[in-house]
From Swiss-Prot:
General function of this protein: Functions as a calcium-regulated nucleotide exchange factor activating both Ras and RAC1 through the exchange of bound GDP for GTP. Preferentially activates HRAS in vivo compared to RRAS based on their different types of prenylation. Functions in synaptic plasticity by contributing to the induction of long term potentiation.
Pfam families attached to this UniProt entry: PH (PF00169), RasGEF (PF00617), RasGEF_N (PF00618), RhoGEF (PF00621)
Ranges of residues in domain N-terminal Ras-GEF: 635-756
Protein name: Ras-specific guanine nucleotide-releasing factor 2
Bias (Low complexity): 761-774
C-alpha cells in the first residue's frame, strides 16, 4: 500500500495561525462536499497562495487547506434545484454567488464555493487570482528591469550633475574675476572724469532733450532686437530647428502607436495562446507559440523603456538630446536580429497551424477583438520588421536638420550606421515573406476558407475583376450582350491567380469573398487555356464578335470528376493579354517542369530536380550573386542580390522561367539597366544561343549517359556527366545536316487495355508500322500520322533496323523514347481528327485519364476540319517540341546515328528552346508593359525587326510562328488606350463651355465627374515614374510629370472645395455648401473614389474652414457623423490601415489615394540602397517595389463607365474659382474674427 504524502504539519498550523490573523481575505463561505454533494458553511482564510478553512471563526486548528499555485478561478451559474414546493428557498439559493477553483492536474476535482453577496464573491475571486507565486516572479522581473533602467538613468544624472557643479564653480570664478575688472574700470573712470557741475544747474530743455534721446535709444534698441529676432526666426537655422522638433514630436507619436501595437500582439495573442497551449486539448503547442512569437515580449519591454525615455526628453523641451536614447537601443539589436531571422519561419509555422480548425477558430476570436481593428496576427508580426527602417528614416531627417558642429551629430550618425546594417536584413526578410502574408490575407478574406493558400510554396501572381459568362450544355454560350448590366452585375467575379491554382470568387456587400461552389478552385495542372474560343471551338464560333475578342476559355478536366468549362470576359484587350500571359506561364511552370522531369527520368541518369540541384550557380552564393532561403515558383531559391549579368542570365535560363521573377524584372529593370540591354540579351539568345548560354547550363542540360557502356557503369553522380559538354557545340549547321527530314510518327488509338497508353511507333511510311514488343494494339486501330520533321532530326530508321537489334540493350532506350514521345505529343494531335479516326467506343472521357498531367495542353492548336489525312500536320507546341527533342537527345542514339547527327539534334533542341524563351519574354513584355514601346520608338522598331527575323526562320514551329505573329500584331496595331478618355481631351472639350454655378449642379453629378477626372489622371501615370523616388527630386517636374500633375489636381480640387464654401457671405449658405460637399464625398466613397473623399475632407479640415465655429454649428449632426466616418476611412493613422483594408474589400474600378503608395515606395527607397557595396542589384528591394506597382496597376487598368459631362467638368477644372491659401485665411478672419484673449 502506497504511503500518504508527508508534510510539515507544525509549520502548516503556524501558517494557519497567521492566516487567521493576517490573511489576505477571510470570511465565511459555503463549500460543496465531494461525497454527498451538500453545502457546508466554513470559515476560510487566504494566506499568500494557501487557502485554509476552519469549522468556525474561533477554531484554532484548520479543518483543511488548499494549495492555490497554478490554479484558476471562475464564476459558475447556480446549479438547478429540484422540487416545486420550495420556490422561496430556491430563489434564495439562486441569488447566491457561486464560483469554482480549478486545479491544473487532470483528475483533480474542483473546489466549489458560494457566498451570499456578489461583491464578496468578486473579492474572493480576485484574491484567489492574485495568489500566484509565478505571477509575483513575473512582476518582480519587470520591476527589476525598470529598476536597472532607473539606476542607469540615476547614474547618468549623477554624472550630468557633477559636470554642472564643475561648470558652476568655473562660472563663479569667472564672475569674481569680472567683478574685480569692473571695480578697476570704475576707479579708472572716476579718475578720468572731469569736474561736473551740479545737476540742479542744468537747463530744463537739456533735461527734456536727454529724456527724448533716452526714449529714442530705447526704441531703437527694441527695434534692433525685434529685427534680430525676426531675422533669426526666418533664418535657415531656426527653420531647421523647427523641423527637427517636428520630427521628434512625430517620432514620439509613432513610437506610442508602435508600443500599443506590440501591447496588442503580446496581450491579445501571445499570452492567450500560451494559456490555450496549457489546456487539456491544446489547439497549439508551446513550441509553436515560441516559434511564432520569438522575442515579441522582450521587444515590447524594450520599446516601453525607449518610449518613456522619449517622453522624458520631450518634457525638457526645447532642449532635446536623443543620442543617448539610441545608445540604449543599439545593444538590444541582437534581439531584433533573432526576431528578423525567425520571421519567415514564424509565418510558415502560423500558416501550418491555421490548418488546424480549432486553432483557426480560436485565432479568429482573438482577431475579432475591437483593439485589433480588423487586423490579422501576421500583420502584427510584421510591425517590428518596419520599425528599424522607420528609425533610419527619422535619423536621416534629424541629421539633415542637425548642424555639423552639433554635439549629437556623431552619435546619431553612428546609430544610423548600425541600424542600416540590420535594416538591410529586415528588408530582405520582409521581401521574402511578402508572398506568405499576401496568401494569408486573401485566405482570411474568403468566408469558407481556402486550405490551398496555406501552402507556403504557393506564390500569388495577380488578381482582378473578370466577368463569368454563363454557359449551357456542350459549352454553348448563352446569347448575352457585352453591355448587359445584368451580366456585369451577376457575372462579375474576383479572380486570383497563383502559381498552382486559379480562384474564382464573388464578393458580398460587406466586402468578404465567397468561393464559387462549382469551379471556385481550379488546379492549373488540370486546366486547358483557350485564348480565342471562336477559333478553337465550333460551338462558340462568333463569340468573338459578341464579346469583342475579350473572352477566353478555361477547360477543366479534373481526374476524379466530369470535365467542365469556364468562360471569362476581361474588361479590355490589354487586360486579357496580361491574364493570358500569366496563366499560360503558370501552367508552363507546372507542366513543362513536370514534362522535363518525365523525359529525363525515362531517358537519363540525371533527373531535372537533380539537374537543378547539381548546378551550384542556382543555389550557392558567389561574388556576383546571393540567394535567400525562399524558393520561387520553379522550386529554385529566390535571388536576393545579383549582378546585372546574372539577372539577365536567369531571365534567359532555358531550363525554367519563374513567373514571379519575370514580373519583378519587367517592372524594375530600368532601375539597374536599360531596355536596349535586355532586348540585346534576348536577341543574342535567339541568334547565338550557344555562346549566350553559360557552359555549365549546357553541360547539365544534356547530362545523360554517353553510350551503352556508360549506362551500366556510370551513375548519376559521375564527374563524366559534368564534363560531357565542356565546350559548346558548333554553331554553323549545313543544309545537309539540317534537322528538316521526312520523318513521320504514327499515333495509335484507342487505349491499350493493359498499359493504358497510346502506342507511338516509328515508320518509314504511314502504312508501315513497327509494333512494340511489350504491347501490341488491338486489331481495330486508327492511326494519325504526325509530321514531326521539325521536331526530330534523327535519320529514318526502317523496321528492319529495329528488328535486327532486338537483343541489343539499346532497345530499352528506344522503348523509353517512344513512351516519352507519346506523352509529349498526346495533346498535340488534332482533336477533331483523332475523334474521327478512332474507334467509336473511345470517347474523350476515356482518353482523359491517360493524359500526362505534365503535358502543356493550354497551347493546343486545332487544324481546320477540311484538311485531309495526307497533308494534315500536327502543330506541336514549343513545350511539346522541346520535350520530344529532349527525349530524342536525352539517351544514347540507336545504331546508325553518327556524332554529327547527334550534335544536330542537340543544337536543334537549344535553338527551339531559345526561340520559345525569347517569344515568351517578349509576349509578357508587350502585353503588360506596352508603355515601354509607346514611349520608345527605337525599342519598338528593334523588337519588330527581331520578330520579323524570327518569322523568317524556316525551322520555326507553327505554334511559335503564331506566337510571334500575335506579338507583332500587338505591337503594330494602334494604341488601345485611345478609346479611353484623356485629361487633354476633357480640357479641350470644356474650353468653349459656359461655366456652371455650384447651386445648379447636383451632388451626384459632381461626384461622378470628380471620380472620372481622378481616375483619368491616375490611370495616365506610367509605372516607370514610381521608380527612383523622382517625385522628391529637384527636377521632379521633368522626371515625374504625371505624378506631379496628379498631386496638382488633388490640391486644385481641395482648393476649389474650400473656395466654394468661403464664397458665401451668410452662415446658412456656408453650412449648406458644407453639407453638399460631404454628400459628394459620400457618393465618391460609394463609387470607390477614395482620392476624391480625401480631397473633400482635407478641404473641410483646413484651418480657414475648420475655425468657422458658427458655420459648423449650423451643420446637422448627421452630416458631422458622416464626416467623421469618411475621415476615419481615409485617415493616415497606422500607414492608412483603414484605407488599405477598404481597398482590399472592394472590387475595381477604384481610385486609391496616390500618396499612400508614394509613402510606401519612399519607405522602401530610403530604407535600403538599390545596389550593395559590391555593386550587386538589391533584387529583394526590386521585388517589394514590384508588389506595390502591381497593386497600383490593378486599379489603373479597370475603367469607370461614367459618361463625361462637359459642363460639370468645366466647373471642376475652372482655375478662376480657386482662392489661394493666404487669401482664404484672411477671408475667414473677416467672416468670423478672432475672439479677444
Amino acid at each position: 500500500m502506497q504511503k500518504s504524502v508527508r508534510y510539515n504539519e507544525g509549520h502548516a498550523l503556524y501558517l494557519a495561525f497567521l492566516a487567521r490573523k493576517e490573511g489576505t481575505k477571510r470570511g465565511f463561505l459555503s463549500k460543496k462536499t465531494a461525497e454527498a454533494s451538500r453545502w457546508h458553511e466554513k470559515w476560510f482564510a487566504l494566506y499568500q497562495n494557501v487557502l485554509f478553512y476552519f469549522e468556525g471563526e474561533q477554531s484554532c486548528r484548520p479543518a483543511g487547506m488548499y494549495l492555490l499555485e497554478g490554479c484558476s478561478c471562475e464564476r459558475t451559474p447556480a446549479p438547478p434545484r429540484a422540487g416545486a414546493g420550495q420556490g422561496g428557498v430556491r430563489d434564495a439559493l439562486d441569488k447566491q454567488y457561486y464560483f469554482t477553483v480549478l486545479f491544473g492536474h487532470e483528475g483533480q476535482k474542483p473546489l466549489e464555493l458560494r457566498c451570499e453577496e456578489e461583491q464578496d464573491g468578486k473579492e474572493w475571486m480576485e484574491a484567489i487570482h492574485q495568489a500566484s507565486y509565478a505571477d509575483i516572479l513575473i512582476e518582480r522581473e519587470v520591476l527589476m528591469q525598470k529598476y536597472i533602467h532607473l539606476v542607469q538613468i540615476v547614474e547618468t544624472e549623477k554624472i550630468a550633475a557633477n559636470q554642472l557643479r564643475h561648470q558652476l564653480e568655473d562660472q563663479d570664478t569667472e564672475i569674481e574675476r569680472l567683478k574685480s575688472e569692473i571695480i578697476a574700470l570704475n576707479k579708472t573712470k572716476e579718475r578720468m572724469r572731469p569736474y561736473q557741475s551740479n545737476q540742479e544747474d542744468e537747463d530744463p530743455d537739456i533735461k527734456k532733450i536727454k529724456k527724448v534721446q533716452s526714449f529714442m535709444r530705447g526704441w531703437l534698441c527694441r527695434r534692433k532686437w525685434k529685427t534680430i529676432v525676426q531675422d533669426y526666426i526666418c533664418s535657415p537655422h531656426a527653420e531647421s530647428m523647427r523641423k527637427r522638433n517636428q520630427i521628434v514630436f512625430t517620432m514620439v507619436e509613432a513610437e506610442s502607436e508602435y508600443v500599443h501595437q506590440l501591447y496588442i500582439l503580446v496581450n491579445g495573442f501571445l499570452r492567450p495562446l500560451r494559456m490555450a497551449a496549457s489546456s487539456k486539448k491544446p489547439p497549439i503547442s508551446h513550441d509553436d507559440v515560441s516559434s511564432i512569437f520569438l522575442n515579441s515580449e522582450t521587444i515590447m519591454f524594450l520599446h516601453e523603456i525607449f518610449h518613456q525615455g522619449l517622453k522624458a526628453r520631450i518634457a525638457n523641451w526645447p532642449t532635446l538630446i536623443l543620442a543617448d536614447l539610441f545608445d540604449i537601443l543599439l545593444p538590444m539589436l541582437n534581439i531584433y536580429q533573432e526576431f528578423v531571422r525567425n520571421h519567415q519561419y514564424s509565418l510558415q509555422v502560423l500558416a501550418n497551424c491555421k490548418q488546424n480548425r480549432d486553432f483557426d477558430k480560436l485565432l479568429k476570436q482573438y482577431e475579432a477583438n475591437p483593439a485589433c481593428e480588423g487586423r490579422m496576427l501576421e500583420t502584427f508580426l510584421t510591425y517590428p520588421m518596419f520599425q528599424i527602417p522607420r528609425y533610419i528614416i527619422t535619423l536621416h531627417e534629424l541629421l539633415a536638420h542637425t548642424p555639423h558642429e552639433h554635439v549629437e551629430r556623431k552619435s546619431l550618425e553612428f546609430a544610423k550606421s548600425k541600424l542600416e546594417e540590420l535594416s538591410r536584413v529586415m528588408h530582405d526578410e520582409v521581401s521574402d515573406t511578402e508572398n506568405i502574408r499576401k496568401n494569408l490575407a486573401i485566405e482570411r478574406m474568403i468566408v469558407e476558407g481556402c486550405d490551398i493558400l496555406l501552402d507556403t510554396s504557393q506564390t500569388f501572381i495577380r488578381q482582378g475583376s473578370l466577368i463569368q459568362v454563363p454557359s449551357v450544355e456542350r459549352g454553348k454560350l448563352s446569347k448575352v450582350r457585352l453591355g448587359s448590366l445584368s451580366l456585369k452585375k451577376e457575372g462579375e467575379r474576383q479572380c486570383f491567380l497563383f502559381t498552382k491554382h486559379f480562384l474564382i470568387c464573388t464578393r458580398s456587400s460587406g466586402g468578404k469573398l465567397h468561393l464559387l461552389k462549382t469551379g471556385g478552385v481550379l488546379s492549373l495542372i488540370d486546366c486547358t487555356l483557350i485564348e480565342e474560343p471562336d477559333a478553337s471551338d465550333d460551338d462558340s464560333k462568333g463569340s468573338g464578335q459578341v464579346f469583342g475578342h475579350l473572352d477566353f476559355k478555361i477547360v477543366v478536366e479534373p481526374p476524379d470528376a466530369a470535365a467542365f468549362t469556364v468562360v471569362l470576359l476581361a474588361p479590355s484587350r490589354q487586360e486579357k493579354a496580361a491574364w493570358m500571359s500569366d496563366i499560360s506561364q503558370c501552367v508552363d511552370n507546372i507542366r513543362c517542369n513536370g514534362l522535363m522531369t518525365i523525359v529525363f527520368e525515362e531517358n537519363s541518369k540525371v533527373t531535372v530536380p537533380h539537374m537543378i540541384k547539381s548546378d551550384a550557380r542556382l543555389h550557392k552564393d558567389d561574388t556576383d550573386i546571393c540567394f535567400s532561403k525562399t524558393l520561387n515558383s520553379c522550386k529554385v531559391p529566390q535571388i536576393r542580390y545579383a549582378s546585372v549579368e546574372r539577372l539577365l542570365e536567369r531571365l534567359t535560363d532555358l531550363r525554367f522561367l519563374s513567373i514571379d521573377f519575370l514580373n519583378t524584372f519587367l517592372h524594375t529593370y530600368r532601375i539597374f539597366t536599360t531596355a536596349a540591354v535586355v532586348l540585346g540579351k534576348l536577341s543574342d539568345i535567339y541568334k547565338r544561343p550557344f555562346t549566350s548560354i553559360p557552359v555549365r547550363s549546357l553541360e547539365l542540360f544534356f547530362a545523360t549517359s554517353q553510350n551503352n557502356r556508360g549506362e551500366h557503369l556510370v551513375d548519376g553522380k559521375s564527374p563524366r556527366l559534368c564534363r560531357k559538354f565542356s565546350s559548346p557545340p558548333p554553331l554553323a549547321v549545313s543544309r545537309t545536316s539540317s534537322p528538316v527530314r521526312a520523318r513521320k510518327l504514327s499515333l495509335t488509338s484507342p487505349l491499350n487495355s493493359k498499359i493504358g497508353a497510346l502506342d507511338l511507333t516509328t515508320s518509314s511510311s504511314p502504312t508501315t508500322t513497327t509494333q512494340s514488343p511489350a504491347a501490341s494494339p488491338p486489331p481495330h486501330t486508327g492511326q494519325i500520322p504526325l509530321d514531326l520533321s521539325r521536331g526530330l532530326s534523327s535519320p529514318e530508321q526502317s523496321p528492319g533496323t529495329v528488328e535486327e537489334n532486338v537483343d541489343n540493350p539499346r532497345v530499352d532506350l528506344c522503348n523509353k523514347l517512344k513512351r516519352s514521345i507519346q506523352k509529349a505529343v498526346l495533346e498535340s494531335a488534332p482533336a477533331d481528327r483523332a475523334g474521327v479516326e478512332s474507334s467509336p467506343a473511345a470517347d474523350t472521357t476515356e482518353l482523359s485519364p491517360c493524359r500526362s498531367p505534365s503535358t502543356p495542353r493550354h497551347l493546343r492548336y486545332r487544324q481546320p476540319g477540311g484538311q485531309t489525312a495526307d497533308n494534315a500536320h500536327c502543330s506541336v507546341s514549343p513545350a511539346s517540341a522541346f520535350a520530344i527533342a529532349t527525349a530524342a537527345a536525352g539517351h544514347g542514339s540507336p545504331p546508325g546515328f553518327n556524332n554529327t547527327e547527334r550534335t544536330c539534334d542537340k543544337e536543334f533542341i537549344i535553338r527551339r528552346t531559345a526561340t520559345n524563351r525569347v517569344l515568351n519574354v517578349l509576349r509578357h513584355w508587350v502585353s503588360k508593359h506596352a508603355q515601354d514601346f509607346e514611349l520608345n520608338n527605337e525599342l519598338k522598331m528593334n523588337v519588330l525587326n527581331l520578330l520579323e527575323e524570327v518569322l523568317r526562320d524556316p525551322d520555326l514551329l507553327p505554334q511559335e510562328r503564331k506566337a510571334a505573329a500575335n506579338i507583332l500584331r500587338a505591337l503594330s496595331q494602334d494604341d488601345q488606350d485611345d478609346i479611353h478618355l484623356k485629361l487633354e481631351d476633357i480640357i479641350q472639350m470644356t474650353d468653349c463651355m459656359k461655366a456652371e454655378c455650384f447651386e445648379s449642379l447636383s451632388a451626384m453629378e459632381l461626384a461622378e465627374q470628380i471620380t472620372l477626372l481622378d481616375h483619368v489622371i491616375f490611370r495616365s501615370i506610367p509605372y516607370e515614374e514610381f521608380l527612383g523616388q523622382g517625385w522628391m527630386k529637384l527636377d521632379k517636374n521633368e522626371r515625374t510629370p504625371y505624378i506631379m500633375k496628379t498631386s496638382q489636381h488633388f490640391n486644385d480640387m481641395s482648393n476649389l472645395v474650400a473656395s466654394q464654401i468661403m464664397n458665401y457671405a451668410d452662415v446658412s449658405s456656408r453650412a449648406n455648401a458644407i453639407e453638399k460637399w460631404v454628400a459628394v464625398a459620400d457618393i465618391c466613397r460609394c463609387l470607390h473614389n477614395y482620392n476624391g473623399v480625401l480631397e473633400i475632407t482635407s478641404a473641410l479640415n483646413r484651418s480657414a474652414i475648420y475655425r468657422l465655429k458658427k458655420t459648423w454649428a449650423k451643420v446637422s449632426k448627421q452630416t458631422k457623423a458622416l464626416m467623421d466616418k469618411l475621415q476615419k476611412t481615409v485617415s493616415s493613422e497606422g500607414r492608412f490601415k483603414n484605407l488599405r483594408e477598404t481597398l482590399k474589400n472592394c472590387n475595381p474600378p477604384a481610385v486609391p489615394y496616390l500618396g499612400m503608395y508614394l509613402t510606401d515606395l519612399a519607405f522602401i527607397e530610403e530604407g535600403t540602397p538599390n545596389f550593395t557595396e559590391e555593386g550587386l542589384v538589391n533584387f529583394s528591394k526590386m521585388r517589394m517595389i514590384s508588389h506595390i506597382i502591381r497593386e497600383i496597376r490593378q486599379f489603373q487598368q479597370t475603367s469607370y463607365r461614367i459618361d463625361h459631362q462637359p459642363k460639370v467638368a468645366q466647373y471642376l477644372l475652372d482655375k478662376d474659382l480657386i482662392i489661394d491659401e493666404d487669401t482664404l485665411y484672411e477671408l475667414s478672419l473677416k467672416i468670423e474674427p478672432r475672439l479677444p484673449a
